Amino acid sequence: MSTLFFTFSLLLLAPLLVISSIQDPELVVQDVHRSINASLTRRNLGYLSCGSGNPIDRLLAMQPQLGKKSPAFSYCAIGFGKNAIGGKNGRIYVVTDSGNDDPVNPKPGTLRHAVIQDEPLWIIFKRDMVIQLKQELVMNSYKTIDGRGASVHISGGPCITIHHTSNIIIHGINIHDCKQSGNGNIRDSPNHSGWWDVSDGDGISIFGGKNIWVDHCSLSNCHDGLIDAIHGSTAITISNNYFTHHDKVMLLGHSDSFTQDKGMQVTVAFNHFGEGLVQRMPRCRHGYFHVVNNDYTHWEMYAIGGSAAPTINSQGNRFLAPNEKYRKEVTKHEDAPESQWRSWNWRSEGDLMLNGAYFRQTGAGASSSSTYARASSLSARPSSLVGSITTNAGPVNCKKGSRC
């Protein structure tokens, strides 16, 4: 990597393009792929490194032994979702039954029975499980789903819905192959069930949610989005996740006409956007979005996009462009003529651009710190550290009775 150096060019009277030039592109790309392979190896070893430069992993590595509730776990959160406390003040609920999913009268010991309770709960799993739901899993507030110590998969059916609830932490879960559900009754609390229309088939759907933290999950191959946050959702952190094999990865904002999303604030940090991804990493509307210290190793159309004048603050990320000549641009300004999107506030600061990647800056530009104050949620680390920061992205293979 010593042969790498940056040159940023300013195009007069046009949106800014952030580009980097490298002396030997092939060597740099090979080095990045070696880094990715090493990260996968370390992840499978089953421990978190305090020296990775990742502040969440540093704190998680100091937590008590698995199987014991740690109130300090919630204090590991960073970014706009840092106030998500999950089930910190509640008892431990152990999921023992991976089957018997009854959407209306869930059986005690199932994940569905746990997430609908009115009280705060810290939900853990007795053993490795594959959970195939019959209807979407509608969560009540103040819940932590903690998959550490087991290999937990939610797949093959509808997946997770956070609907007008708050203070939810989802950690260490494999979420994949999520399907649409049909119309049907679903219980969302011990005392209420109601009729739900067909779901979108998202991995995690956040609808009017607040104080949400999704961390160290793997997400792939769902019917619609992997994570979608819409309808006034805010105070969200999406961190340390491993995204693969999907088209429309992450939607933040319901529609161009839904102006209630103007107050949305989302942090996307320390994630690895890996093989088989096409677009929306994320796609933003209206609000304020801090995209920081992520590793983008694959995209087919674009990485970061948006419409309806979102403020996007991209800092300290690593972007490895595809080899195809016309797919080098990181960004995509959508659903507006250039005369409009030129004024949208999108900046790239300290990002590492590889293999011809470039970021089209618009609006106030990188130097206007006040413009990006509402889209700033933590201090970015240097992009040269992204490989180590994201080395444990996705669920970590922790063992019960020991620290992660």
From Swiss-Prot:
Disulfide-bond pairs as recorded: C159-C178
Subcellular location per the Swiss-Prot or TrEMBL entry: Secreted
Active-site residues per Swiss-Prot or TrEMBL entry: R280
Signal peptide span: 1-20
Keywords, ordered alphabetically: Calcium, Disulfide bond, Glycoprotein, Lyase, Metal-binding, Secreted, Signal
GO function terms (MF aspect): metal ion binding; pectate lyase activity
Cofactor note: Binds 1 Ca(2+) ion. Required for its activity.
Glycosylation site residues: N37, N191
Reactions the enzyme catalyzes: Eliminative cleavage of (1->4)-alpha-D-galacturonan to give oligosaccharides with 4-deoxy-alpha-D-galact-4-enuronosyl groups at their non-reducing ends
Listed Pfam families: Pectate_lyase_4
SMART domains registered for this protein in UniProt: Amb_all
UniProt record similarity statement: Belongs to the polysaccharide lyase 1 family.
Cited function: May have a role in the development of the transmitting tissue of the style and/or in the events related to pollination such as some aspect in the facilitation of compatible pollen tube growth.
Name assigned to this protein: Probable pectate lyase 18
Organism: Solanum lycopersicum
Lineage of source species: Eukaryota, Viridiplantae, Streptophyta, Embryophyta, Tracheophyta
